[in-house]
Amino acid sequence: MEISINKEKALVVFSGGQDSTTCLFWAKKRYKEVVAVSFDYNQKHKLELECAKDICKKHGVEHHILDMKLLNQLAPNSLTRADMKVDEDAPKDGPPNTFVDGRNLLFLSFAAVFAKQRGINNIITGVSQSDFSGYPDCRDVFIKSLNVTLNLAMDYQFVLITPLMWIDKAETWKLADDLGVLDIVKNETLTCYNGIKGNGCGECPACKLRKNGYVEFKRLYK
């Protein structure tokens, strides 16, 4: 039996941060119809959902927010608990306390259920192995494994697409520049674990990675 894949539609897993926003505009260049889905897991940096909503509204992207607050009950971490301070540096052993067990597994699984109902095969996510910050669920091997599992679980042909998988933050900034959305990514996104839009707090690991990448981008490409 021939498998039919709709190449005109794509679903973007969209947090409102640098990486997923870059992926959103990457998708808009390649697909006729782009839908974005975000997840509310009671994150402290909840302003990211407002950023996601605003970006989608401004640029004509259909946007949905799914309730995933159950994840906060299952996996205590510094992104959801006010009494836990965000690790400023990666620990020597194990992932940092900003890692949310099962987050990408659950997000991509729920995104796949949503996509199937809409007749969408292509699911785009901004994970990167080059800058994976010690998060095991950002690795290429995980994405490939999950892609197979989702296809088997739902008897459907999903294609998990990772435009940033093998590029670093400097190259991600360059991609945003090439797409003509550098200012949008720089000013309208939220990457900061402490919930500060744009350049962020400058102290958390996400802000350091973002800033260092931007400095390197300016040095190499501008």
Curated annotation (Swiss-Prot):
Q: What is its EC number?
A: 6.3.4.20
Q: How is the cofactor bound?
A: Binds 1 zinc ion per subunit.
Q: Which Gene3D superfamilies match?
A: HUPs (3.40.50.620)
- Origin superkingdom: Bacteria
Pathway-wise, it operates in: Purine metabolism; 7-cyano-7-deazaguanine biosynthesis
UniProt: ATP binding residues: 14-24
The protein's required cofactor(s) are namely: Zn(2+)
| Signal sequence range | none
Q: What Pfam families does this protein's entry cite?
A: QueC
Residues holding Zn(2+): 192, 201, 204, 207
Query: Its Gene Ontology biological processes?
Result: queuosine biosynthetic process
Reaction equations catalysed: 7-carboxy-7-deazaguanine + NH4(+) + ATP = 7-cyano-7-deazaguanine + ADP + phosphate + H2O + H(+)
Q: Which keywords does UniProt give here?
A: ATP-binding, Ligase, Metal-binding, Nucleotide-binding, Queuosine biosynthesis, Zinc
Please give one Gene Ontology molecular function term for this protein: ATP binding
| SUPFAM superfamilies cross-referenced by the UniProt entry | Adenine nucleotide alpha hydrolases-like
For the keyword Calcium, the answer is no
As for family, the record states: Belongs to the QueC family.
NCBIfam families, per database record: 7-cyano-7-deazaguanine synthase QueC
Its function, per the record, reads: Catalyzes the ATP-dependent conversion of 7-carboxy-7-deazaguanine (CDG) to 7-cyano-7-deazaguanine (preQ(0)).
Subunit comment? Homodimer.
| Protein name according to UniProt | 7-cyano-7-deazaguanine synthase
